[in-house]
Amino acid sequence: MKNILIINGHQKYDQFAEGNLTKSLIHSAENFLSENGFIIKYSVVESKYSVEEELEKFKWADGILFQYPVYWAGLPWLTKKYVDEMFSSGEKSVTFEDDGRSRMDSSKKYGSGGLMKDKKYMLSMTYNCPSSEFNNKDGFWEGQSLDQVNIATHKTFKFCGASQLESFAIFDVY
């Protein structure tokens, strides 16, 4: 795994969420990856982008580092829009062939038609929530882990065949 796509999924809100922590985390990842011989390309969801050019980055990448703040228990809406555009537009070419099922072969399962089987991904998130709220049956997330709370994003990558690396999060951000 030498080619890494770093996606900056920050959505700015003036005086509330400027994006400095996201930039700092991306800078740290960039330093580590560069020092270890990785080749890096970047995507910034807030920037104007070409879907075709972004899909070429997805095709090129061996690994995807997806850095974003968690807003209202999920992806910022601009980031969700980016994900929807990339994964849907990549059908039949980059992200998935079909949903995996076959009328001719009942052993083929839903979610097995991904074209990203040679790729790995990592979610790196920032949370206002303290870490003590995860894996705590009395906590806000009612016993769920970080990965369980982010199941929709994980399943999106899984549907496309990508393998999950360990997630990372910074908590108590405000």
Task: Annotate each language-model stretch with its function.
Residues 9, 45-47, 70:
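Active-site loop/turn elements of alpha/beta-hydrolase fold enzymes
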Residues 1-36:
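N-terminal beta1-alpha1 ligand-phosphate binding loop
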Residues 21-24, 140-174:
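Glycine-rich phosphate/pyrophosphate-binding loop and the adjoining helix
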Residues 50-153:
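Helix-loop-strand module that forms the ligand-binding subsite of alpha/beta enzymes
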Residues 32-39, 113, 119, 156-165:
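A structural motif corresponding to the C-terminal end of an alpha-helix
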Residues 36-49, 171:
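A short beta-strand-loop structural module common to alpha/beta enzyme folds
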Residues 5-7, 41-43, 65, 122-124, ...:
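Hydrophobic/aromatic beta-strand patches that form the interior of the parallel beta-sheet core
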Residues 10-14, 128-136, 172-174:
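A short, flexible beta-alpha/helix-coil linker loop
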